[in-house]
Amino acid sequence: MSANMHIFENPSALAEALADDVGARLAAAIAARGTASLAVSGGSTPKAFFRSLSRRELDWSKVTVTLVDERFVPPENDRSNHRLVADNLLKDGAAEARFVPLYQAAETAEAAAAIASGRTASLGAPLDVVVLGMGTDGHTASFFPGGTRLEEALDPTTPRGVITMEAEGAGEPRLTFTFSSLQDAGYLVLHIEGSGKKEVLAQAEASGDEAEMPIRAMLRRAASPLQIYWAP
């Protein structure tokens, strides 16, 4: 599937434009169905976007927010994506949104993934908006090169839902939506910043194995065109 590149002068301009575009998609979903779904990613890159989006005029009570992936850590942990979203997105008007976490207080990551799969099924499919990030190793979501369940995660026949992932570069065990859960979003975004990430993207767009740079799965096989938002 083709990708569309959206280039901005700086990260601030990107954050505002992405918030406008995502807000418009959510508003359209609410107008059409009465509800909207949004899955976002962690890391430092989306903080400004989250803050901009939280200020958009929407009927946030009709929006359900979840995460593309999460570490198997409780929300009070500094490395929790849940905490990042709570601190930066679920505030101002967006405090009215419903949030469905991937982390669950279970004995194991596998048990948490099973619970999260059940709870996130309430969002319906496809998701209205998915905002992905990308690491310097070419991972997206928790699709890490060398990941324990990477082949399963990227297999389009794997059912929608949340599975576990462990990898050398991942730190804690991860919980991640499968490729099948994300690839047909109504608006599928890759948000990256900096020259380094642009170089990684160029590598990913070249020939090579998806398992080496899993973002290639989204670039090549997503049902929705990948909307790439980049700023230096």
UniProtKB/Swiss-Prot annotation:
Keywords: Hydrolase. GO terms for molecular function: 6-phosphogluconolactonase activity. Its EC number is 3.1.1.31. It catalyses: 6-phospho-D-glucono-1,5-lactone + H2O = 6-phospho-D-gluconate + H(+). GO terms for biological process: carbohydrate metabolic process; pentose-phosphate shunt. Pathway: Carbohydrate degradation; pentose phosphate pathway; D-ribulose 5-phosphate from D-glucose 6-phosphate (oxidative stage): step 2/3. Hydrolysis of 6-phosphogluconolactone to 6-phosphogluconate. Belongs to the glucosamine/galactosamine-6-phosphate isomerase family. 6-phosphogluconolactonase subfamily. PANTHER family: 6-PHOSPHOGLUCONOLACTONASE (PTHR11054:SF0). NCBIfam families: pgl. This is 6-phosphogluconolactonase. The gene is pgl.
